[in-house]
């Protein structure tokens, strides 16, 4: 058994240093930012390398086996390069597997355990005696580029989808008061953030748990309700992008805000399947025929609306006929952005008891057919943009080409707009790009 690394600390007069690894979804990234903001306020500095830090924090993901493997690999790297490691995040909610492989970790905590992580850091390497609070900018420490930021409006989820263990990891829905969310958003915009990406486990359920209670914002009371919060965010002067929106009827209310230009005409809506029988086994809401009618209505109100969704193929018991239902629905819906995942069992999920697994080769073939169908849809939609002038937020500039995203593209998961330019263009600028060429995911053109 390896001996626990001896306590160490910064050189006399130097600030203690933290190295940080953040894995998983945008909600986990927000958790990481909160921890770093707290530690930075206490005088800790951020190290670029594990071997230059006094302690390493790894924020893990534990949703899928592949995510667990990535988390364990990251922990292993931190142990090898530093040896003084604190683990937190979703995988930490079930610490036995982590401790079995890495018994000498300083601490293992679950998700949202901010105070426990900070306490473990204090024990490993105490903060400076006189921390300078002005080390932290008003908007906090962000791990995203300066021009966009994730805005988490709630924790947890009260749905009980059979393939998901998020409620057991993060608990039931807990919404933030609207005024708290808006104050954070305002600080971000004042700090130069051009795009706010609203995230949670179930964005459209925001406020249900606190009965849509009001809180004071500026000169008025604002309800903790999906529409009300979206409307107020739309007044801050930044792009506002809505993620993880379930297709509830009250989502209809925000579409006019998109048509008016208050928020981006973009909905990230994880539908997961279209066959009623599969959705029933998944314990998912939604009549898919009704969803088609709703999507048509949304597009009539807001013709520029881009809809992103994710789907699972190979769910236990999925027949060829049920998969064909999904393909037919996809062709009818004509969604702009789509991701597809082969079903992967998750320890603790009730779907594991369904039996009748789909063979791996069949799952892979269905994913191929699904994406082939979607790529054809996406290419037709993209080609319709050729000749148009689109606003694009610039993410990078290199070699006379700016790469960014249109209003239809979220960072990391959607397409890229590649634009040649002659006048100066900087990261974070919002420029107009004339589109000359289209692929299924990316667009090409020049800055107008």
Swiss-Prot record:
- Where in or outside the cell? Cytoplasm
- EC number(s) per UniProt? 2.8.4.4
Question: In which residues is [4Fe-4S] cluster 1 bound?
Answer: 25, 61, 90
Please give the catalytic activity noted in the UniProt record: L-aspartate(89)-[ribosomal protein uS12]-hydrogen + (sulfur carrier)-SH + AH2 + 2 S-adenosyl-L-methionine = 3-methylsulfanyl-L-aspartate(89)-[ribosomal protein uS12]-hydrogen + (sulfur carrier)-H + 5'-deoxyadenosine + L-methionine + A + S-adenosyl-L-homocysteine + 2 H(+)
Enumerate the spans annotated as MTTase N-terminal domain: 16-126
Say if the entry is tagged with keyword Transferase: yes
Radical SAM core domain location, by residue?
143-380
Q: State the source organism's domain of life.
A: Bacteria
Which protein family is it in? Belongs to the methylthiotransferase family. RimO subfamily.
Protein name, per record: Ribosomal protein uS12 methylthiotransferase RimO
Origin organism is Methylobacterium radiotolerans (strain ATCC 27329 / DSM 1819 / JCM 2831 / NBRC 15690 / NCIMB 10815 / 0-1)
The gene name on file is rimO
């Amino acid at each position: 058994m390896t001996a626990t690394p001896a306590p160490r600390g910064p050189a006399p007069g130097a600030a203690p240093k933290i190295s940080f690894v953040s894995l998983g979804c945008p909600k986990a990234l927000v958790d990481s930012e909160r921890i770093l903001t707290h530690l930075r306020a206490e005088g800790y500095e951020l190290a670029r390398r594990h071997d230059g830090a006094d302690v390493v924090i790894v924020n893990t993901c534990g949703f899928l086996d592949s995510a667990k493997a990535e988390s364990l690999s990251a922990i292993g790297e931190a142990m090898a390069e530093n040896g003084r490691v604190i683990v937190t995040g979703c995988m930490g909610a079930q610490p036995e597997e982590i401790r079995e492989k890495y018994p000498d970790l300083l601490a293992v905590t679950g998700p949202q355990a901010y105070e426990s992580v900070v306490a473990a850091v204090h024990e490993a390497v105490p903060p400076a005696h006189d921390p300078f609070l002005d080390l932290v900018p008003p908007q906090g420490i962000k791990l995203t580029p300066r021009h966009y930021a994730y805005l988490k409006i709630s924790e947890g989820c009260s749905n009980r989808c059979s393939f998901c263990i998020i409620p057991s990891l993060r608990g039931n829905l807990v919404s933030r008061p609207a005024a708290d969310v808006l104050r954070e958003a305002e600080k971000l915009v004042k700090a130069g953030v051009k795009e706010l990406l609203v995230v949670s486990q179930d964005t459209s359920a925001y406020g249900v748990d606190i009965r849509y209670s009001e809180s004071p914002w500026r000169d008025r009371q604002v309800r903790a309700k999906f529409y009300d919060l979206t409307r107020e965010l739309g007044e801050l002067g930044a792009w506002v992008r809505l993620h993880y929106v379930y297709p509830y009827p009250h989502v209809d209310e925000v579409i006019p805000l998109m048509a008016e230009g208050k928020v981006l005409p973009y909905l990230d809506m994880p539908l997961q399947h279209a066959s009623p029988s599969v959705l029933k086994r998944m314990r998912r809401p939604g009549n898919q025929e009704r969803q088609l009618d709703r999507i048509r209505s949304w597009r009539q109100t807001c013709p520029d609306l881009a809809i992103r969704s994710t789907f699972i193929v190979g769910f236990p018991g999925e027949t060829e006929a049920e998969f064909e239902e999904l393909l037919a629905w996809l062709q009818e819906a004509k969604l702009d952005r789509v991701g597809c995942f082969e079903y992967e069992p998750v320890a603790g999920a009730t779907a594991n008891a369904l039996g009748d697994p789909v063979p791996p080769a069949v799952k892979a073939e269905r994913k191929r057919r699904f994406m082939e169908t979607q790529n054809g849809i996406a290419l037709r939609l993209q080609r319709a943009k050729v000749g148009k002038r689109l606003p694009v937020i610039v993410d990078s500039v290199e070699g006379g080409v700016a790469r960014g995203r249109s209003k239809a593209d979220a960072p990391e998961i959607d397409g890229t707009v590649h634009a040649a330019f002659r006048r100066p263009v900087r990261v974070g600028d919002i420029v107009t790009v004339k589109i000359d060429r289209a692929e299924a995911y990316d667009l090409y053109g020049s800055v107008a």
